[in-house]
């Protein structure tokens, strides 16, 4: 009886902070080429999570990766004063899906393993990196909303 009452009270209270032993959220951002949108999302997510004192971290991946990072995205991140995430465009792998607590497809279709994981969401309103500012602004809006759910 007491357990049932406590469970009901906790359910009404909503999400809580993870316990000290709980793994920090790991987000995987995925875009078509793993070179621009997912890179920008990763850079902003990691910066903003750290500013909020969250242990959550992100990585970037691609569905059909390019050989190098987008010159426009790298230049834009540098202008914004952000650290360029380490790495190069890499395909999303089964290990990424397993390690992730959240997977975000930014303007692309994810492989079946990611969509079936129950961890995937899509951000389909982010414009291409032809105009860095509009792309960044849409991504930052989504990242802020995501971080608000991880408090």
Predicted regions and their residues:
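Bacterial N-terminal signal peptides
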Residues: 2-13
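A general, composition-driven signal for non-globular sequence regions
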Residues: 11-12, 31, 130
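Phosphate-binding/catalytic loops
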Residues: 102, 108-151
């Amino acid at each position: 009886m007491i357990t049932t009452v406590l469970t009901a009270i906790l359910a009404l209270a909503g999400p809580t902070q993870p316990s000290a032993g709980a793994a920090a959220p790991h987000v995987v951002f995925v875009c078509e080429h793993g070179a621009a949108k997912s890179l920008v999302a990763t850079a902003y997510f990691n910066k903003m999570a750290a500013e909020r004192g969250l242990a959550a971290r992100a990585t970037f991946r691609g569905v059909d990766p390019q050989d190098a990072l987008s010159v426009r995205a790298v230049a834009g991140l540098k202008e914004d004063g952000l650290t360029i995430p380490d790495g190069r465009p890499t395909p999303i792998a089964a290990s990424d899906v397993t390690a992730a607590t959240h997977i975000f497809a930014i303007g692309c279709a994810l492989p079946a393993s990611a969509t079936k994981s129950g961890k995937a969401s899509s951000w389909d309103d982010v414009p291409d990196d032809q105009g860095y500012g509009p792309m960044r602004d849409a991504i930052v809006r989504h990242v802020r909303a995501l971080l608000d759910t991880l408090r």
